[in-house]
């Protein structure tokens, strides 16, 4: 089996090298090449988000009324969560359920999200991560820790600010082993406002462009010639 570079285990902890990056601007202002470069990153284990918010804050969430029961004295109450009638992850592999809950504990205790333990944001974190969309759960279920990371690509060409729930999702998935890539042709700040400290690298690749329309990336042609680019900096570990 071919292991990903820098993959390791320490006792019962799996250490997964991941990317969390924001790519600002458009190289040389060439829009068609910009979309082609993003298209090149998409694999069968890639999810692309281009409409916001991805997680609707007011959408039905069966577990939300109960989350205050699930975090006591600085610890996630795993047994109580798993035995609760509203717990929806029982169909996942046991190791994936444990992985989700372990990373949820870390996300809260490290206070990665602004407002944690100050205004109840920890409960928003709990309700968000315990009610993940089906497509995310399917990606987690088939996650092989020893191979290449699944990717989440988030494209925001306009002025909409990412929601708190989407910021929680991306921070969690990065802890869980996903590569997270934000493509922001405008260069605007979006996700940064939700973090207590710098979480991601920013790569300025070119001039800022506005009001771009995201095409159907499955129909975008791949680059004709492979040249060294900002992608090599992002994925230098592969």
Regions found by a protein language model. Name each.
Residues 2-13, 136-147:
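Short boundary motifs at domain starts and secondary-structure transition points
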Residues 1, 14-25, 32-127, 201-237:
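Conserved N-terminal ligand/cofactor-binding loop architecture of enzyme catalytic domains
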Residues 7-25, 148-157:
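Short hydrophobic beta-strand segments
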Residues 125-143, 150-194, 198, 202:
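Active-site and donor-binding regions of nucleotide-sugar-utilizing enzymes
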Residues 7, 20, 52, 70, ...:
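Phenylalanine-focused residue identity feature
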Residues 3-8, 28-44, 163-179:
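Histidine-anchored nucleotide/phosphate-binding helix
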């Amino acid at each position: 089996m071919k292991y990903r570079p820098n993959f390791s285990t320490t006792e019962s902890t799996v250490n997964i090298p991941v990317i969390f990056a924001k790519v600002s601007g458009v190289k040389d202002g060439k829009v068609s090449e910009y979309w082609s470069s993003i298209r090149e990153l998409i694999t069968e284990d890639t999810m692309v988000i281009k409409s916001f918010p991805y997680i609707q804050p007011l959408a039905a969430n069966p577990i939300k009324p109960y989350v205050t029961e699930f975090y006591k004295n600085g610890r996630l109450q795993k047994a109580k969560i798993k035995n609760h009638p509203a717990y929806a992850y029982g169909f996942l592999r046991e190791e994936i359920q444990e992985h989700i809950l372990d990373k949820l504990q870390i996300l809260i205790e490290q206070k990665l999200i602004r407002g944690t333990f100050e205004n109840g944001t920890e409960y928003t974190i709990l309700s968000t991560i315990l009610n993940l969309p089906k497509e995310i759960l399917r990606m987690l279920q088939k996650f092989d820790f020893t191979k290449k990371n699944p990717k989440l690509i988030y494209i925001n060409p306009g002025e909409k600010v990412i929601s708190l729930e989407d910021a929680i999702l991306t921070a969690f998935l990065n802890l869980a082993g996903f590569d997270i890539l934000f493509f922001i042709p405008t260069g605007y700040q979006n996700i940064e406002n939700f973090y207590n400290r710098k979480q991601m690298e920013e790569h300025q690749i070119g001039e800022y462009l506005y009001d771009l329309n995201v095409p159907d990336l499955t129909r975008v042609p791949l680059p004709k010639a492979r040249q060294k680019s900002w992608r090599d900096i992002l994925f230098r570990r592969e």
